[in-house]
Amino acid sequence: MTTDTITTTTETTGTPGNPVLHASGVTMRFGGLTAVRDVELTVNSGEIVGLIGPNGAGKTTFFNCLTGLYIPTEGTVSYKGKVLPHKSHLVTQAGIARTFQNIRLFANMTVLENVLVGRHTRTNEGLWSALLRLPSFKRAERASEERAMELLEFTGLAGKRDHLARNLPYGEQRKLEIARALASEPGLLLLDEPTAGMNPQETRAAEELIFAIRDQGIAVLVIEHDMRFIFNLCDRVACLVQGEVLVEGSPATVQGDERVVAAYLGTPFEGAPGAEEAAEVNAAEASAEAAAAEAAETADEPPADAPADAPSASTKDDTSTTGTTGTTGTTGSEGDSK
């Protein structure tokens, strides 16, 4: 099956079931910087969940905590009720796969070989079996190749199985990353900006592909900045701001939340993460401006021991100018009278 023949429409929704992923109190600090703070998020089976937020909100850092690339400073990540280990290959083996914000393919390997790499956690043959080319290894190799070809059919890349990955168009490289992730037979697929850099046609194809993945019973958690794409695709959306979950709910709820709009436009709002610090900065700036204005006024005032009728420097300038102008004006008037 290719994405051109997928009949799933954007109105199709999954039937959310039991929790697949549960992040509890996940916090990630880098020295004195808290990139992710006390995040709670659940993804259910048969569900597509979107994670949005401004640049630097901590979305990819949160993904890295989920997949074992980072060890959270605090909190736990559970998959199907079991706490995940802090090693990425064990997370993949447990049933979580991901793609990356920047494409990470093996550029000099073929399309088929890239997908076969994703099968390594699902084969049990060891080093000696591979070196000696034992019958069990050959059977596993054939099974992996058959499954890889099924995934290439599914993503519409079967006709390019022998092409080098670097020679694929950008949109097809994104599809290949998804096919490689699916090769590990995940129960949860994490997509980090899957439509970044795509044109509208490629974006629509990616949307159809994700719906088809969901229809196969795979839960999806997706980061994306294309709001039209995310609100059309997801059953539920969470907005992350400065490392904290600001709001979570249906696409319509999140889309209509003024706090989400304010977070994207950079307008502080009451109760926002970092709003208190922003208010302190604004107050300090206002105080500094007031002090500067007061200092300027003090500089224009005459000294305390100066005669009361002594004009200040600025007054003298004004008087001089006025006097000159007045004299000129008077002289001119007298000339006119004469």
Briefly describe each language-model feature range.
Residues T2-E285, E289:
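Glycine-rich phosphate-binding loops of nucleotide-dependent enzymes
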Residues T267-K338:
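ABC ATPase nucleotide-binding domains
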